[in-house]
Design a protein with these regions (language model features):
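Short acidic, glycine/serine/threonine-rich loops at helix termini
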Residues: 39-40, 102-108, 133-137
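Basic, short loop/linker segments at the boundary and entry of helix-turn-helix/winged-helix-like folds
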Residues: 1-12, 146
Length: 163
């Protein structure tokens, strides 16, 4: 049994994300922080190396569970519809939003349709508030329509859980 459980690794990573930190190395800022540990119910905060290795090993395996949990959370939120003379409608905004990762050597970075090097993730936001319902990281070279029907089908299935 590992000294640092997979649960502690995942909770530590979620803790980083909630704090707006996305680099594995930033976990080092919280390794000796008792409040971080207690607030997340973690026995041991992993090192940056352990966090990176475990998350890389689990790549993609948590995607469905995370999206389902997000849908459950959003199902409890008061989503504001858009009112028109024909009735109320829950807005769903879907967009490919290229990220500028110029001068990096990250895997998947490529020339986007905006003419910069980066990724071309797809996002789906719901409600007038614009809560994130679904997302998909895509290589920068991927055409914006490739995989879109599948992304929309997944998004509509998640949306059905909210309404």
């Amino acid at each position: 049994e590992p000294k640092i459980t997979n649960g502690d690794v995942v909770r530590s990573y979620f803790g980083l994300l909630v704090l707006g930190r996305t680099a594995y190395e930033e976990i080092e800022l919280y390794r000796a922080n008792g409040f971080f540990r207690r607030a997340l119910g973690i026995r041991r905060v992993p090192s940056a190396e352990t966090l990176r290795q475990r998350m890389d090993r689990a790549a993609g395996r948590f995607d469905i569970a995370i999206k389902e949990a997000n849908a459950v959370l959003l199902g409890g939120a008061a989503l504001t519809p858009v009112k028109t003379e024909l009735g109320e409608y829950l807005p769903l905004d879907v967009d490919v939003s290229p990220f500028d990762n110029s001068k990096t050597h990250k895997e998947g970075v490529g020339r986007t349709y905006k003419g910069m090097d980066g990724y071309a993730p797809n996002f789906a936001y719901v409600g007038a508030e614009g809560y994130l319902l679904n997302c998909e990281l895509r290589p920068g070279t991927q055409h914006c329509q490739k995989g879109t029907p599948e992304f929309l089908a997944e998004t509509f299935a998640l949306l059905a859980r909210l309404t």
